[in-house]
Design a protein with these regions (language model features):
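Intrinsically disordered, low-complexity, charged terminal extensions of DNA damage-control enzymes
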Residues: 1-21, 190-335
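Catalytic cores of DNA base-excision repair glycosylases
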Residues: 5-204, 208-220
Length: 335
């Protein structure tokens, strides 16, 4: 791969995003956590909202989890919001060495190790923050980078170690060519996101197609990497939505661990449990909701009943599944 060609391409096409105009480690970490499972346009909205309210780790640490989750609502993958709150409190723990701040500049290994010691920070996020905030040569590996490596080498099933080695080698070549680590990592990721896409690959616009073995292979670039078999488990649940005379539902806060931890919603139980049979007794089936998670399919029967006192869900952090369940129940009540 020609580092200069990729860096030149990136300089011409790089998207103007606010987290690319700062070296604040907290702002960059927040963007990386959001963008792991959220598209850029939506991530920008949530990044601005969260950074306005929590401009420092200390500001988030001082808030309770419910406020953080309420601001996170709609961004999806709610465990990220919980872990971010845990991270902020860990950074601000008076017995910890952080002093309320993310790591000071140091060696690449030291900064990456320090970041990975924090809740919810894995190798990708640590490398991204180290390279973008501190310009340290820590090569990132995400789905986009993995795809570029696989196609450049025409390797259908590269191991994690092989992908990291390739990314590290590219980083060394880029730094030797005078390219900043922050620029290089973002260039490779953007190449995978906008040109070397999973489908609809744009080889004609690729600045490094000359070195791409996937393009010249008989199978073509989209054959790489080989798709992984995906196993989706189906769970059947019963959601109980009891409404008061004003149409407000009875809501409970979910436990601090497990699916949708800390969020609010109607009681929801396994459809095959003894509790499900008892909860369905005397209530009416309002409808069904199918909800897809990354490796799980949730099929939910929504039943409705009556309660003396409900709560307005707008003021509480809820999951997108709970929002859909409540909509089915309220539509049934209004019919």
């Amino acid at each position: 791969m020609d580092p200069a060609a990729l860096a030149g391409w990136y300089a011409a096409v790089a998207r103007d995003l606010p987290w690319r105009r700062t070296r604040d480690p907290w702002a960059i970490l927040l963007s990386e956590v959001l963008l792991q499972q959220t598209q850029v346009a939506r991530g920008l909205e949530y990044w601005s909202r969260l950074l306005d309210r929590f401009p420092t780790p200390a500001a988030m640490a001082a808030a309770d989890l419910e406020e953080v989750m309420h601001l996170w609502q709609g961004a999806g993958y709610y465990a990220r919001g919980r872990r971010l709150h845990e991270l902020a409190r860990a950074v601000c723990d008076p017995d910890a060495p952080w002093g309320g701040l993310l790591p000071s500049p140091g060696t690449t290994d030291d900064v990456v190790a320090a970041l990975q010691s924090l809740p919810g920070i894995g190798p990708y996020t640590a490398a991204a923050v180290a390279s973008i905030a501190y310009d340290l040569p820590a090569a990132v590996v995400d789905g986009n980078v993995r795809r570029v490596v696989s196609r450049q080498s025409a390797s259908g099933t590269p191991s994690d170690r092989d992908v990291q080695r390739a990314a590290d080698a590219w980083m060394e070549q880029a730094v030797a060519a005078g390219i900043a680590p922050s620029v290089w990592n973002q260039a490779v990721m953007d190449l995978g996101a906008t040109v070397c896409r999973p489908r609809g690959v744009r080889c004609s616009a690729c600045p490094v197609k000359a070195s791409c073995k996937g393009t010249s292979s008989e199978e073509g670039p989209e054959a790489f990497p080989a798709p992984k078999p995906r196993r989706v488990k189906t769970e059947r649940l019963v959601a109980v939505v009891d409404l008061d005379d004003h149409g407000r539902p009875h809501l409970v806060q979910r436990p601090a661990t497990g699916r949708f931890a800390g969020l609010w919603g109607p009681p929801m139980v396994d459809a095959n449990s003894e509790d499900a049979a008892a909860l369905r007794a005397g209530r009416t089936v309002a409808g069904h909701v199918t909800h897809l998670l990354s490796h799980r399919r949730l099929e939910v029967v929504v039943v409705v009943g009556r309660t003396d006192e409900g709560r307005l869900p707008d003021a509480l952090p809820t999951s997108s599944l709970d929002d859909r369940v409540l909509a089915v129940a309220m539509d049934h009540a209004e019919a």
